[in-house]
Amino acid sequence: MNSLRIIFIILISFTISKPTYAKNPSDLIKEIVDQASDVLSSDDPVESKIIKLNDIAERSVDINGIGMYTLGKYRKSISEEDKSKYQKLFKSYFLKSFSSRLVDYTDPKINVVSEKKVSDKYTIVNSILEASKGRPEVKIDWRIYTKNPEKPLIRDLMVEGLSLARTQKEEFNSVIQNNNGDINSLFKVLEEFIIK
């Protein structure tokens, strides 16, 4: 799962937002970015930043939606009990994956350049992460779930065209397929990551 590291690092850098939500997806991302810069460049202990990140991420990212998508075809064949177990494990996995890399970015600068409504439920916000010392400019596209305009949620982001959700789906499905379709093999991988 190391292939997702850069995506998780970038995701953590921009998931700090206020409890209220902007109705406009571009405004939502701008709000997230502005506050992320303040929090990540502060002198707060890393532990404090992680607590804030996890609390806010649960409100600004559709973790459950991403988790069910990453199960792919298996979400239709597993029992409700296994589905519930997976959702809990994925949430813990997801939060630990990016919060543990919080310190990788201290003052991200990102500019929202455009947005495009692709359906009644989704809007894509296009942005650029400015180049910094040792880091090139990066194109980031945010997939915002806007079915409830009062509470838009991040459901995916594409870094230079690479989708976080799709990449995770491929990795999870590979684990299950390589273990004869046994969902418990994925549970084991997630549990090992969470406790290490």
Predicted feature residues:
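Low-complexity, intrinsically disordered terminal/linker segments enriched in charged
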Residues: 156-196
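Bacterial N-terminal signal peptides
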Residues: 7-15
